[in-house]
Amino acid sequence: MKKIMITGALGQIGTELVVKCREIYGTDNVLATDIREPEADSPVQNGPFEILDVTDRDRMFELVRDFEADSLMHMAALLSATAEKNPILAWDLNMGGLMNALEATRTYNLHFFTPSSIGAFGDSTPKVNTPQVTIQQPTTMYGVNKVAGELLCQYYFKRFGVDTRSVRFPGLISHVKEPGGGTTDYAVEIYFKAVREGHYTSFIDKGTYMDMMYMDDAIEAIIKLMEADDAKLETRNGYNLSAMSFDPEMVKEAIQEYYPNFTLDYDVDPIRQGIANSWPDSIDTNCSRGEWGFDPKYDLASMTKLMLEAIEQKDTVKNNN
């Protein structure tokens, strides 16, 4: 990869992906795009940025062509809970945007990455140690979009020889940008509330285990996969990824190592709880580890320490300004 265009660059993943890619490949070699302008304090501000509605095929082609990109990272999407409330919009954005990105990739002979998700699994999927290849059958519009997206990526690889690469992300946890619209958001919100209020009310019930990963490991995984030897990659629809699996009570206990008085209660959101119940408790990542060296560095304990320290520092800086 030498010149990279990133869609959805202001999202939770996109923001940190832009920063890391600019560190590695050079600021001017990474074009960030999104449907809105970045905020004044956004780290995306320090390099090339263009407005892009990913459903606008002509505009996407224009940006790829004018920037002379050799790689496209398509991160723009409507997330799980938001997609469930707006299924038509979700289909139009998630599928229309992906088709435009794949067509741009095919037309301009790009390297291509787009994320799938554990949301691609459903009620009939094995819940524990979920295999790489298994029954999926999701029960949400977001999950349907992700399965269809996986199949499209595989189709473009087999039919047109397009270099498509993807991973099934678990819940991603970061202090840089607070998320919005996801079922796993509680696992980010809980840290901010612990520092700022000493209490959190979870919309996901106790005993609900979901796969998770610290954002640094997720960004590293994207770059490692994109730099991997093409000949070693046997999966083109989406590699299973996970670094840990936990429920809200486990996060509470990890936080109480640093905030002993932190408390947790529950006000379960039936929509997001239903989505979570349809997902695996834990997934098998052996294919990712074996084919391109996936090796996450953070577990719940080390991630908790970093999250709390980072939020404390962020609040200190904000209060001093």
Swiss-Prot record:
- GO BP terms: threonine catabolic process
**Classification via Pfam families:** Epimerase
What superkingdom heads the lineage?
Bacteria
Gene3D superfamilies in the cross-refs = NAD(P)-binding Rossmann-like Domain
Q: Which InterPro entries match?
A: Epimerase_deHydtase, NAD(P)-bd_dom_sf, NAD(P)_epim/dehydratase
Q: Which SUPFAM superfamilies match?
A: NAD(P)-binding Rossmann-fold domains (SSF51735)
**GO MF terms held by the record:** L-threonine 3-dehydrogenase activity
Q: Which PANTHER family match?
A: L-THREONINE 3-DEHYDROGENASE (PTHR42687), L-THREONINE 3-DEHYDROGENASE, MITOCHONDRIAL (PTHR42687:SF1)
State the similarity comment: Belongs to the NAD(P)-dependent epimerase/dehydratase family.
> What is the name attached to this protein's record?
Uncharacterized epimerase/dehydratase SAB0504
Q: Which organism is it from?
A: Staphylococcus aureus (strain bovine RF122 / ET3-1)
